[in-house]
């Protein structure tokens, strides 16, 4: 009869977990998503071929606890051209610019989103742009980006 000792795993640092009785709601100014509408065809060197502003409103549920949020603009379908570009498969790349904290959003990474300390709500402003990467393709196009939120 052989016996094997099972490895023992110990969780440490659990005393550093802070439980808060708060929640935050996140509302997109365009609940149906960002719609660029009809875009004329373009040449590969056309630069930005469409731009659409949108905002995200973050609200506390009425509590007074301080907390911050991180966000991940996670690509559900599609491939990235680089950390900040989503290939739209139509000769363009989708980029999202954070106008509140000027920088291009890096997809599939958590980053600072909103500090709710001493605030009941925070509004963030963004611009979504389609930048030409090739000859414009006719037809409908759609990609899904999911906003994941972590409390920190």
What are these regions (language model features)?
Residues 1, 5-152:
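Mature extracellular/passenger domains of Gram-negative fimbrial/pilin and adhesin proteins
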